[in-house]
Amino acid sequence: MKDVLGATPVPYMKNGKFGYKDKVGNVVVECKYDAAYKFSEGLACVRLNGKWGFIDKLGREVIKCKYDTANDFSGGLARVVFNGKHGVVDKFGNCTLDK
């Protein structure tokens, strides 16, 4: 996993799994995800083994893949569902769920 000139990687699929490439086609994150979305506010939403989490541009899992659903970041927060409870998570992984 490498960061090429600070470029934002884009998702691609190979053999039914998703990873990320830089703008010239170099693999930045190997294909291991079941689903992968574009980067939003520096993080990308990915699904691994049926659970959602977030990676940074170097492919580091900064928010563990543990959510039932997750949306892109907007205004520093992402909407998530965990064990049937709705809430939001910040970029540090701090999660607030409805009671």
Regions found by a protein language model. Give the residues of each.
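Residue-level detector of conserved, function-critical positions
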Residues: 1-99
